[in-house]
């Protein structure tokens, strides 16, 4: 199984580009696991593969154990933000032993700095402490050394691997609302763009507020994406000049990697889709022929097929005059594409910190290994990534940078900066 995953990462993954040779060699450790399936063996195999994938710097690469508890792979019931010599607990949702502001001084007896000084730093996703993602190491830790914020006392705890999944909870009931902050400012928070009707409903209910506002503060700090349809209702309030939704979002076509492995999987997918949807034999054959003709040709440009209504120019609404967008590394997916679109609008200013930087590689493929595990990887690149101007690991930069400090444990500093602009 690992041989197949390694081959996919080297040849079929849209971000391969020779980077597979730079990944950690976990093969000797995988080989020691043996072939007999046991719960312990599977758990260790997942840990090794997840570490290998984390070192690519692309969170789109994932492996999932089928039939397991559908919690997020790296969930421990809290999140932590890295500083120079420790991790600060910045949110707790399912661990009553911890409080916001507590410090994590060591993981499995090793200081935080030790993880930055060897190959493990590649699994942190970020090049600066405030952008590091410690989820992998927290999830697989046996002990965490904690310093209490309130008392300064220290204790060791075992992470709660059965914690509720904050991401799943957020996806079930994503935060979405709009409210006035003062006579001239409206604040809108969107944590998901998946439900276009819900976004349209909030826009419709607050249309008057938005039109009268001098400034819209649009909070995308926790928005993991969703769909481009979820952006469309916002268009009249975000644009400077008349433009279609397609023009606003920019080129949404993709460079798809037609490797042999990808083409084999695409043909199998077409045959399955044909069977389920009742395609004619001619329709199926035409699509299979198209794929086979492109096999092993490398990256092939495929333009986006936009709905007709996305090509019709839209007039900007009378308000707001300015749009201030709140951003942090929790912003990902379609929300990052929205950020890039807003960078092209003169009325928009991005405040905070860079987004996650995980949207260069798209069009996810799923490989089923013996109905036991699923491996997920992207097979296409955005035009920007293909031209060497991607945002992977870097994110969309803020116009007004707000560095993370301990003050954010007590106050929403990014929002304060936005309101003062």
Task: Please state what every model-predicted region is.
Residues 1-216, 220-251, 258-266, 322, ...:
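Flexible, low-complexity junctional segments that flank or bridge functional domains
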Residues 228-409:
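Conserved acidic, small-residue-rich alpha-beta core segments centered on
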Residues 67, 397, 411-413:
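Juxtamembrane/interface motifs at transmembrane-helix termini
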């Amino acid at each position: 199984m690992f041989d197949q995953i390694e081959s996919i990462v080297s040849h079929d993954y849209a971000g391969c580009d020779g980077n597979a040779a730079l990944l950690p060699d976990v093969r000797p450790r995988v080989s020691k696991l043996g072939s007999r399936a046991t719960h312990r063996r599977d758990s260790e195999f997942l840990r090794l593969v997840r570490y290998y994938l984390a070192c690519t710097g692309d969170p789109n690469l994932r492996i999932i154990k089928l039939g397991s508890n559908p919690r997020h792979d790296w969930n421990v019931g809290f999140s932590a933000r890295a500083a120079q010599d420790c991790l600060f607990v910045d949110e707790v949702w399912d661990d009553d032993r911890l409080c916001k502001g507590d410090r994590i001084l060591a993981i499995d007896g090793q200081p935080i700095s030790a993880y930055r000084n060897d190959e493990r730093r590649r699994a942190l996703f970020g090049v600066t402490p405030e952008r590091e993602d410690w989820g992998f190491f927290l999830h697989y830790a046996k002990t965490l050394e904690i310093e209490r914020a309130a008392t300064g006392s220290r204790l060791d705890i075992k992470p709660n691997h059965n914690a509720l999944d904050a991401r799943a909870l957020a996806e079930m009931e994503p935060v979405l609302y709009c409210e006035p902050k003062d006579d001239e400012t409206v604040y809108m928070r969107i944590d998901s763009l998946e439900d276009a009707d819900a976004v349209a409903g909030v826009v419709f209910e607050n249309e008057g507020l938005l039109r009268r506002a001098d400034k819209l503060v649009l909070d995308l700090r926790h928005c993991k994406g969703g769909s481009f349809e979820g952006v469309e209702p916002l268009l009249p309030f975000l644009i400077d000049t008349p433009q279609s939704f397609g023009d606003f979002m920019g080129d949404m076509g993709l460079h798809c990697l037609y490797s042999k492995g990808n083409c084999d999987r695409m043909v199998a997918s077409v045959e399955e889709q044909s069977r389920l949807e009742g395609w004619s034999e001619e329709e199926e054959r035409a699509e299979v022929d198209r794929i086979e003709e492109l096999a092993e040709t490398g990256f092939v440009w495929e333009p986006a097929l936009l709905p007709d209504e996305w090509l019709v120019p839209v007039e900007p609404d009378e308000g707001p005059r300015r749009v201030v967008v709140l951003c942090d590394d929790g912003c990902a997916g379609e929300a990052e594409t929205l950020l890039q679109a807003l960078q092209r609008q003169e009325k928009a200013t991005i405040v905070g910190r860079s987004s996650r930087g995980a949207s260069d590689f798209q069009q996810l493929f799923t490989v089923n290994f013996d109905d036991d595990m699923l491996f997920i990887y992207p097979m296409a690149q955005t035009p920007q990534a293909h031209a060497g101007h991607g945002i992977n690991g870097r994110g969309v930069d803020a116009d007004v940078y707000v560095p993370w400090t301990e003050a954010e444990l007590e106050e929403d500093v990014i929002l304060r900066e936005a309101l003062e602009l």
